[in-house]
Amino acid sequence: MSSDAMSDYSHDDEHDPQTDELRETALVTLEALISSCSSQMQSYLPNTINSALRFLKYDPNVADMGEDEEMSGTQDDGSEDDVTEEPDLEDDDFEDFEEEGGYSDIDDMSWKVRRCAAKLLYAVISTYGRGRALDDTSLYQQIAPAIVARFNKEREESVKLELVSTMDALVRKTAEGSMIMTSSGFLESVGSGSKISRKRRRQDSDASMIDFEPSMGTSSAAGTPLAAPSSPQSGPQSELANALPVIVRSLVTMWKQASIHLKQAIIILLKSLALVRYGGLADHLQQIEDPIADVLKSSLSGAPSASIGISASAGTLQIETLSLISAISETHASDALLPFLIALIPGVIVAVNDKNYKVSSEALAAVEQIVKALTPPRVTTASQDLIFQLEKLYDVSHSRITDTSADLEVRQRAIHVLGVLLARTSDEQGSAFLSFEKRSKGLVTLVDRLKNETTRLSAVRAIDDVAVLCSRKDDVDSNWVREVTAELGAQLRKSDRVLRSASLETLRSLSMNPNTRAHYDGETMKNLEECLIPLISVEDVHLLAPSLIIIAKLVPGNAQLLVNDGLVSAICSIVRTSLAGTVLKALLLLVKVIGEEGSGLTLMQNLLQDVGVNGDTSVVGRSIGTLLVHGGSNVGVRMEDFLSELQKTQDPQRQCLALAILGESALRLGASCSLTPNVFIPHFNSKSEKVRLASATALGNAAAGNVKAYLPTILGGLEKSDPQSYLLLHSVKELLQHPEMVRRDVAPSALKLWQALLVVSKEEDNRAMGAECVGRLALLDPPAYIPQFQEYLANGDAGIRSIVVSAFRFTLSDSRDVFNDVLRPLIVPLLVNMLSDRDLGNHRLALTTLNSAIHNKLALILPHLGELLPAVLGDTQIKPELIREVQMGPFKHKVDDGLELRKSAYETVYAALDTSFSLSHITELYSRILAGIDDEQDIRTICNLMTSKLITLAPEETQRHLDALSERYTAILNFKPKENAVKQEIEKAQEASTGVLKITRELSKAFPNAETMGDHHKWKAYMEMVRAQFGTQLSNLESEF
């Protein structure tokens, strides 16, 4: 039935139940078409929305079906403020609805029509979102007011439930493109599923080797800074802000007669509002306090636990309500929260003691956020009432830890909460919020839990929180620190890798914080070193860097105790292997402090005699150079000894080692170093490639120490386009790897260097290294150079554009705020420009650059993916003009020059898969996945990964495509290589079959009912074929997992 026909029916004078049934069927059909055929339905969208809105208020038994009041616009006469009010919100208007004059009490089934209309709107919002087909006007001036107006006019529970769910979908769509910090500890785009992990970040990836100072890890107890709710003048956020008072008031009214399921939907909507309008519920907390307290009272009344009769839905409602409290606590300013939270704390405490472990665990999560909201730095003054509330939260958390009858998950969560509370109440200001007695008792409890195998890991992480935020020596006592250190050291010998890593990370925090490190005595440090030395091994580099850093922090003032044969042997064992990044920086830091303490003689002797050229010459050379400079006269050798060695020896290995030592020495000595460029440049002509590269690296290191003396020579060589330009690019790279050291001295020559790099990098062999140098140079002064990328992208030379694209991609790994501020207005225009490059190689580079931007700068580009990803989806299509025939002997072969481009496009789509754009274009996305399965094996593999991910992200759409997937999977499994096929072709076919069987297994497990529902006949036949013909392979896959 068409929308117009439906509209005609609505004007009939008589109420015909059969007509209602037909309308219901039509609306259900429209919902299915919108969900399954979104592209084809775009032209019918306006009519579809109009029909849904009309039948949303279809109620033939009520005489007046006039237009509903608008959500915003003119003020109601009774309004005392600037917020538009809905007139029909009083309770009395709904208590005796059937007694109203316009209502007929005949058997009324029209609610089914209204429910289907609401579900249709839900499908429209979920499928199209805020996209090209559905603009903000339709969402916020048509759909939203109609839903809000219907909230309290609707009588049927099931229709109300659909209305609330539809509004929740709309609210989440409002947040598309905005990054929200959630209580789970992630930056999340609401409604997108995109998460950026807040792992411990060491902001030292670009730090110079010479000034490396490891940073303290972040703590989950530190919380996140609150951002004031934005007040946009226009747009979806503005529309939502205007509607917020009416929505909240309507939900509170609806709550009074709501069932558990409807209450749960209301709570979920309130949580979405709290996250989307970050801090925006501040003026409405008093209104929603009663509904929240109403749910918590089910615990206060002493209801039995889930195991002995409490309904699952009631428990789920409690969990959602506690999650709402967490979200509000995290997103709203403490000044507004205090009365609200203090009123709810008793109910939360009772929920913590609930026998349903899921309720108890979620209540503890709420306690964590409440604690953060009621402690410094968010609260500065400790009132008696506040202290009393915090002590109650402390008591309930502590009691759950010591309650042996509590579920393990609850006890572990309580330990975490206790750690947060103790960490947040340290220092002089924080100590006023928790008594000394309770603090001491809590610290003892953490040690006690550290000794228990089941709670050990949680205790380790809680202690780490305390260590990171300890800001006074008096916050912890010496015995506690020493006992904790001994226990943590013992865990380093355990086989549990997660426990070992967490224990080492906590030891790192204890050693790096001077307030906790001050409690160490000689015996503790000696025992700790003995636990750490076995970890100074290249067998597990993830444990190596923290171990080196811990010892480096303990050595100052304790060198005679700690610098011994065991430590020296361990250092000498790791320099035999190539090291880079943080591990190399940590090693050089340790070598540096050993030299500064005057204890480097034994280490120097061992490095020269026992390792020497047998180790990695770069690592050994940098270690010796560091020790030479910082050990001074105590190490038994001088720089001149290595200069003489370089001039005399003909052994390439010895030359490489001497060059590395001299380069590192010159770097650290700076302008006081007597070495000149002529020490290194003659070796550019060496017959040994290793020596040539070593001399280039050493020249760059020396140049970083004395830019004024070295840069003119390097720049002169580059401007001449010297045949040795590739080596000079290596030197420039090393020079720019010390940005803080060289920034000021490079600045006067930066423009010349920039231009020289672009010229030299035109050569194919120089392009990759040159682009990295251009990127590093741009990062020295982002405001000056990042805007220039746009200018060079218009250059007619494809080679120049290639360099600029690669250089820009290199810069994206920089996480500094100063760079992000420059990049924010430029990144999208730059990417759009790059993606429009017609040069095939450059276009592929642009795709990999967008991929890098999605991984590194998602917050900056997320609101603009609608501008970027449609072109990428276009690049996943096979382009016949890029396929050519090549004659090879008597045979003709087809060569697809677009294959790598398509592969890069699919990789980029995969990277953006869990963003709001992809999920709102899911039908189009699946069409490209289906096409990719028919493509080459590399692309097919990516499509299988995408399908696997969409099982979780878009289960309904994935299930809808099972038949289409099965057709393509069948073709792959039935493919038989020719009898004369070469080994490579046979292996390729086997790899394709295995990949299909793996994803088949995942789909089968995710949708076990698909074979029995009767809607997926092709999928059912396919699964029967797979089990019959590939049962053995499936069994093998099961055993693997």
Swiss-Prot record:
HEAT repeats mapped onto the chain: 138-176, 242-279, 339-376, 434-472, 479-516, 525-560, 598-637, 670-708, 710-744, 780-817, 822-867
Keyword check for Transferase: no
Mutant phenotype after disruption: Cells show a dark red color when grown on an air-medium interface that induces development. Cells are able to initiate the cycle but are blocked in the initial stage of early nest formation. Cells exhibit reduction in asexual development and block in sexual development.
Biased composition annotated in UniProt, kind: Low complexity: 225-237
Domain of life: Eukaryota
Record SUPFAM superfamilies: ARM repeat
Region (Disordered) location: 1-24, 64-103, 189-237
Residue ranges, compositional bias (Acidic residues): 65-103
GO biological process, one term: protein ubiquitination
Gene Ontology CC entries for this record: nucleus
Record field: compositional bias (Basic and acidic residues): 9-24
Function statement: Assembly factor of SCF (SKP1-CUL1-F-box protein) E3 ubiquitin ligase complexes that promotes the exchange of the substrate-recognition F-box subunit in SCF complexes, thereby playing a key role in the cellular repertoire of SCF complexes. Acts as a F-box protein exchange factor when interacting with candA-N.
UniProt subunit comment: Interacts with candA-N. Interacts with unneddylated cullins culA and culD.
Note: In E.nidulans, CAND1 is separated into 2 distinct proteins: candA-N (AC C8VP82) and candA-C, corresponding to the N- and C-termini respectively of the protein in other species.
Entry-linked PANTHER family: TIP120 (PTHR12696)
Family listed: Belongs to the CAND family.
UniProt-recorded name of the protein: Cullin-associated NEDD8-dissociated protein 1, C-terminal part
